[in-house]
Amino acid sequence: MVEVGGGAAEAAAGRRWRLADERCDLRAAETEYVRRFHRHEPRDHQCSSAVAKHIKAPVHLVWSLVRRFDQPQLFKPFVSRCEMKGNIEIGSVREVNVKSGLPATRSTERLELLDDNEHILSVRFVGGDHRLKNYSSILTVHPEVIDGRPGTLVIESFVVDVPEGNTKDETCYFVEALLKCNLKSLAEVSERLVVKDQTEPLDR
């Protein structure tokens, strides 16, 4: 886990947040992505953090899954059902049902930003029976090369209220664990699709 500073002003104000990854070092490009796209301003009663995942699949494939605001169950293992009316556009609201075993059953979520050029997805929780109040996330998708092949770096950051009775660290660790599961599943689904595409006959 790496501590990432949010700039001199934020450091002076005592605001620090982490970027959690399987690796303990960040390349300059990754740090630049965080600085450029993942700008949160947590208040005293909030915490903010991020997770990253390197996926052995091209950006266009990974983004095609991520951008489906209407079908988060494509790669999110804790989602059992999702309903959304209308087209996928900024302001769209989805009703998500959560699988049993988690301290929640449903979540109402609004699409804040969907940028197909920069590959940015931002979502805010606006209701539900969970404890993630004022939760807002930013997910970005970036091209990279892994083992000489097209790959993808996915970074997801968030800010959320710290529930009464919990610490900032406890809240961050809980949310980070959920996001890591989501990104691990995203990697598995994406990489399976790559293998499938490579093994399908050319005359299909």
UniProtKB/Swiss-Prot annotation:
| Cysteine disulfide partners in this protein | 47-172
Give induction info.
Repressed by abscisic acid (ABA).
Q: What are the residue positions of the site described as Involved in interactions with PP2Cs? A: 103, 167
What's an example Gene Ontology biological process for this entry? seed germination
Question: What's the main place this protein lives?
Answer: cytoplasm
Function, in words: Involved in abscisic acid (ABA) signaling during seed germination and abiotic stress response. Acts as a positive regulator of ABA-mediated inhibition of seed germination, and tolerance to drought and cold stresses. Together with PP2C50 and SAPK10, may form an ABA signaling module involved in stress response. Inhibits the protein phosphatases PP2C06 and PP2C09 when activated by abscisic acid (ABA).
In terms of PANTHER family, this protein maps to: ABSCISIC ACID RECEPTOR PYL3 (PTHR31213:SF205), OS08G0374000 PROTEIN-RELATED (PTHR31213)
Indicate the quaternary assembly: Monomer. Interacts with PP2C50. Binding to PP2C50 is dependent on the presence of abscisic acid (ABA). Interacts with PP2C30 and PP2C53.
Name of the protein this chain belongs to: Abscisic acid receptor PYL3
Q: Which organism is it from?
A: Oryza sativa subsp. japonica (Rice)
The UniProt gene name for this protein comes to PYL3
